[in-house]
């Protein structure tokens, strides 16, 4: 199949940042996706519906003329989030979920939840109102190996949480392990997962063999090839529990290429082509539309998009770097490499 037309996809996990960064990130994402779940880990974080609406206005100011883009907003879950904020989310036109970062798990997560049991009163309201809880699924204890943090989260946090709140609508974001994939498969349909392009296309060898490649460094970290293979299998299976979430995360070249580089891969400019490559490599390109355009919207209870995009099987070289902020550069995922699909 050399050409594929699909309903325009949505990105159910993206980082746009704020301020000057929006000049780069919003057009890149809006040219690819009709909607995006916009992560709230700004400085300071987006903690209320009013703050989310204000952030959305800042995003909309950078949408290119003639492009339809609908940012879907998320609140940042803290130890101090009020149960009453959940009803405001439910009644909001643009806010769809709340995001729980374990404190210290990833970029700008210091304000995250210190102990999930402290916020059970809020989670009870999430379950009652069927507001999705989005989870960065890693424990943050210093003694736990970084490659084991997702599995430990499943055992120590997520299993008890779902026993306590079995009807909770929940997305385990950017899953990276076989254990996470199987966990999601074993749950009822109120539990789903997003998968990034980097975790489908690459594994930890790509990051570590032949020199450290900082632009493959993200959290949760790339895992073994066996885990990568399981993710490919579930993503291309047609199971509606798994859908697209890039976790596209912009950091300047200087912030990535230093002695203590930031975590995050910037995939937004060619995201759907990267996913197409992953699906095509296992001869499942016909399954891409469900994963990219159907299952996320269905889970969130939003209508599927009606406009379409077309991808052609035609080589394109991903740019070596892109302009970012005032005078900095950003290195996109797989920079300088050739991929076999192009959005037209």
Swiss-Prot record:
InterPro entries in alphabetical order: Amidohydro-rel, DHOdimr, Dihydroorotase_CS, Metal_Hydrolase
Keyword Metal-binding: yes
Pfam family for this entry, one: Amidohydro_1
Signal peptide: none
GO terms, molecular function: dihydroorotase activity; zinc ion binding
Highest taxon of the lineage: Bacteria
Pathway: Pyrimidine metabolism; UMP biosynthesis via de novo pathway; (S)-dihydroorotate from bicarbonate: step 3/3
Catalytic activity: (S)-dihydroorotate + H2O = N-carbamoyl-L-aspartate + H(+)
Chain sites annotated for binding Zn(2+) 1: 13, 15, 99, 247
PROSITE patterns, A to Z: DIHYDROOROTASE_1, DIHYDROOROTASE_2
Gene3D superfamilies for this protein: Metal-dependent hydrolases
Disulfide cysteine pairs (residue numbers): none
Cofactor: binding details: Binds 2 Zn(2+) ions per subunit.
EC number, as in UniProt: 3.5.2.3
An example Gene Ontology CC term for this record: cytosol
Enzyme's top EC category: hydrolase
Known cofactor(s): Zn(2+)
Active-site feature positions: 247
Role of this protein: Catalyzes the reversible cyclization of carbamoyl aspartate to dihydroorotate.
Protein's name in the database: Dihydroorotase
Organism: Acinetobacter baylyi (strain ATCC 33305 / BD413 / ADP1)
């Amino acid at each position: 199949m050399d050409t594929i037309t699909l309903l325009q996809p949505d990105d159910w996990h993206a980082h746009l940042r704020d301020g000057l960064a929006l000049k780069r990130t919003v057009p890149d994402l809006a040219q690819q996706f009709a909607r995006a779940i916009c992560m709230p880990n700004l400085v300071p974080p987006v903690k209320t519906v009013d703050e989310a609406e204000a952030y959305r206005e800042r995003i909309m100011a950078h949408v290119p003329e003639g492009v339809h883009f609908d940012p879907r907003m998320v609140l940042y879950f803290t130890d101090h989030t009020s149960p009453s904020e959940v009803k405001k989310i439910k009644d909001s036109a643009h806010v769809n979920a709340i995001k729980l970062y374990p404190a210290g798990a990833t970029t700008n997560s210091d304000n995250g939840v210190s102990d999930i049991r402290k916020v059970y009163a809020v989670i009870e309201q999430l379950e009652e109102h069927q507001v999705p809880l989005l989870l960065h699924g890693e424990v943050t204890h210093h003694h736990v190996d970084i490659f084991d943090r997702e599995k430990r989260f499943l055992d120590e946090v997520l299993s008890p949480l779902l026993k306590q709140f079995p009807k909770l609508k929940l997305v385990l974001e950017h899953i990276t392990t076989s254990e996470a994939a199987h966990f999601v498969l074993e749950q009822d349909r109120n539990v789903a997962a997003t998968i990034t392009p980097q975790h489908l296309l690459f594994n930890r060898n790509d990051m570590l063999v032949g020199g450290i490649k900082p632009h493959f460094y993200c959290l949760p970290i790339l895992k073994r090839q066996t885990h990568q293979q399981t993710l490919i299998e579930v993503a291309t299976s047609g199971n509606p529990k798994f859908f697209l979430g890039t976790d596209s995360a912009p950091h300047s070249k200087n912030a990535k290429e230093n002695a203590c580089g930031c975590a995050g891969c910037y995939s937004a400019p060619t995201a759907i082509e990267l996913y197409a490559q992953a699906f095509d490599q296992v001869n499942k390109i016909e399954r891409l539309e469900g994963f990219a355009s159907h299952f996320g919207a269905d889970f969130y209870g939003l209508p599927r998009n009606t406009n379409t995009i077309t991808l052609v099987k035609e080589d394109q070289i991903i740019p070596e770097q892109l302009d970012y902020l005032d005078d900095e550069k950003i290195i996109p995922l797989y920079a300088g490499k050739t991929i076999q699909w192009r959005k037209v």
